[in-house]
Amino acid sequence: MTEKYLKLKDVLESGKFAITAEIPAPVSASSNEMEEKIKILKGSVHAINVTDNPGATAHMSSLAGSAIVRNQGIDPILQITCRDRNRLAIQSELMGASALGINNVLTLAGDPVKNGDQKDAKAVFDINSKTILTIMDAMNNDGKTMSGRELQTKSSFFPGGAAIVHEPEDNWDPKVLSEKASFGARFIQTQFCYDVELVKRYIERIVDTGLSERMYFIIGIGPLRSEKSAKWMKDKLFGTVMPDSIIKRMEGSNDQIQEGADICAELIESFREIEGVHGAHLMAPRNLSAIPETVKQSGITI
């Protein structure tokens, strides 16, 4: 593919507020479902994450999904977990991604196998997400695999990691984030956080440590569908920060889908004003069609 398109790396390095979104890879042997979802988001986001067997259930591979995203003219973010592959498979997948022009890679542990629908599957965890970052760093800078074998062509990965927004204690040292930066992470995407004041306190500490100069921080949110889904996220979804005030606001609305979009747009506007926040990551697997209007309402232009 020769079509030029905005790259997440360039957007972030230019100082523009980035909008990324997530598409769950479909349970399908066809590209049609993926292409339809991409069409919904095109023109409304800078990059699209493609999940890697979310919920520990079998889906189209993230690599294939990312290739489809790229073919549709949007910068993909390949998600790669430690759960399903050993170090050989991970290095092979990374080389394949680079060959396909897929440079954004988000490293994750992966959901526990016990949460999935194939309980007898074996979790691999040969290496952890930090090691994947070091692999990409070596492929980028040294042009070598873990064994020291030279690549014929170096990679140009833009590596990322994940984080959970939390209340920073007085003596909080973001050691894990610092390690990710040292291992080569260039951006961080967080789990859902609908609490602006908490984001301010969390990011203020990040800025104080200088980490916001080493990595770009993209805060996870999404347009809610209902107060029921907001309650479920608060109680069941790992890493989610959902204030009661958001749930009450959803409960009091006669049009909860619109209210959810309004809340998300307002959060984007608020995040733009926080020093050290470089973007918003929109996750709405069952409400994907609400993302374009939400982004438009926030005043962000792609």
Predicted regions located by residue number:
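Active-site pocket-lining/capping segments in soluble small-molecule metabolic enzymes
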Residues: 123-152, 162-167, 209-267, 286, ...
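Hydrophobic faces of well-ordered beta-strands that scaffold small-molecule active sites
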Residues: 19-23, 46-50, 76-80, 105-107, ...
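N-terminal amphipathic alpha-helix/helix-capping segment at the start of soluble metabolic enzymes
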Residues: 1-24, 28, 36, 144-155
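Active-site mouth loops of central-metabolism enzymes
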Residues: 18-32, 76-88, 157-172, 250-262
